[in-house]
A protein has these predicted regions:
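Short, positively charged interaction helices/loops
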Residues: 37-73, 92-116
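Short, basic amphipathic alpha-helical segments that act as recognition/interaction helices
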Residues: 21-44, 76-100
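Surface-exposed, Lys/Arg-rich phosphate-binding patches that contact polyanionic backbones
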Residues: 6-26, 61-80, 84, 102
Length: 116
């Protein structure tokens, strides 16, 4: 799946993502920590947000299917769903030191062994 993030959001994600695959881990973690009912989906194209260059996102078939279904229900793109989820998640992340630490532990746990 191809993802285009607004520049500010891309910078926030980059602060947490250190190696290849971390973006997908962050998206999956954010999806599990944001309540779908409370989400306000923001259109990325129509809002005229400056977007970064496209990047590939590998979240797995189950998550991809769930994102597509959600996007169809809302009548928006999958990119708009992911951007909205990440923006809401990073608002919470800035306010919660515990959530930030939980994310970092989750990322480290999922990386597995990295040679030094």
């Amino acid at each position: 799946m191809t993802l285009r993030l607004p520049l500010e959001l891309r910078e926030a994600v980059t602060e947490e993502a250190r190696v290849k695959g971390d973006l997908a881990r962050i998206v999956l973690f954010a999806l599990s920590h944001v309540d779908r009912k409370d989400m306000e989906i923001q259109q990325t194209r129509k809002a005229g947000l400056p977007l970064c260059s496209p990047q590939l996102l590998h979240v797995g078939a189950e998550a991809r299917t769930a994102l597509r279904e959600w996007a169809e229900e809302e009548g928006v793109s999958v990119n708009a769903i992911v951007v909205s989820v990440l923006e809401e998640f990073f608002k919470r992340l800035k306010r919660s030191k515990a959530l930030r630490e939980e994310l970092r532990l989750e990322i480290r746990a999922r990386r597995g062994f990295l040679p030094s």
